[in-house]
């Protein structure tokens, strides 16, 4: 069993039940899924860019991402409907906990001038969105093979009803929020 999942079951669940006075264990918020999205704007001119993004996302997430395509044509961006413009991957279960553990303990501390992540990125429904400026913070990415520095969005979807509950859950899991 994953280290974070074990910690969640043994320590975090009882602590959250006590703090928020839940009557049932099923009311305790948990992480449902993590969605990693990488927009590749230069895929419009360069079709190979999407392949490198898919490859990098595969290394980072441990599973193959799905290529996202344009829903509408936008003349200003020279974009046609159906053109590949990004890649996303949804992690659940064991892989989700592995990725979160790696993100908290290895990747985030590698960010330059890292002082913690913002507390304001909750959406009001208990989900947290985190933007990363470069994919090089992940240990799986080989620095020499990177063609272009790309950022990504990481959305952590929880079953929490409020932001306060979700913040407490992520703090207990070890998310380094700003003081």
Swiss-Prot record:
Among HAMAP family, the record links this protein to: Ribosomal_uL5_B
Any one GO biological process: translation
Family per similarity comment: Belongs to the universal ribosomal protein uL5 family.
Instruction: Kindly indicate whether the keyword tRNA-binding belongs to this entry.
Output: yes
Q: This protein is called what? A: Large ribosomal subunit protein uL5
Function of the molecule: This is one of the proteins that bind and probably mediate the attachment of the 5S RNA into the large ribosomal subunit, where it forms part of the central protuberance. In the 70S ribosome it contacts protein S13 of the 30S subunit (bridge B1b), connecting the 2 subunits; this bridge is implicated in subunit movement. Contacts the P site tRNA; the 5S rRNA and some of its associated proteins might help stabilize positioning of ribosome-bound tRNAs.
The UniProt subunit note reads as follows: Part of the 50S ribosomal subunit; part of the 5S rRNA/L5/L18/L25 subcomplex. Contacts the 5S rRNA and the P site tRNA. Forms a bridge to the 30S subunit in the 70S ribosome.
Record keywords: Ribonucleoprotein, Ribosomal protein, RNA-binding, rRNA-binding, tRNA-binding
- Any one GO cellular component localisation term in the record: ribonucleoprotein complex
